[in-house]
Amino acid sequence: MTFPRLILMVLFSIECGFLFAQEPLTIISYNVENLFDCQHDTLKDDYSFLPDGMHHWTYYRYQTKLDRIAQVIVNISGWESAALVGLCEVENTRCLLDLCYRLKRFHYKYVHYESDDERGVD
């Protein structure tokens, strides 16, 4: 056996040992389907998710939706927190901040990007 081949085999066996020592990770991708707060964003067409709008979106309904989303994330994660949670259809950072507050024991941080959606869904 040549020396380079021996080095390659040793490195491969060391790498495989590290692979087996890894902990499993939970990654969640979740379409929360229109997570809007109940305050108007002047730059967006979010009128249907206001108390007087088509969906009669109230503070109570917003809080209930946040509670349910948080419960789903906890149920999926089990005893360990998910390593990454990706959410779709979230209106703004306020919604993410409110959700992270409900999940504060997991110490989640968030990254938010504004989309070009007229309604404000990101």
Question: Which ranges hold each PLM region?
Answer:
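Bacterial Sec-dependent N-terminal signal peptides
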Residues: 1-23
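N-terminal, active-site-proximal structural segment of metallo-dependent hydrolase catalytic domains
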Residues: 20-121
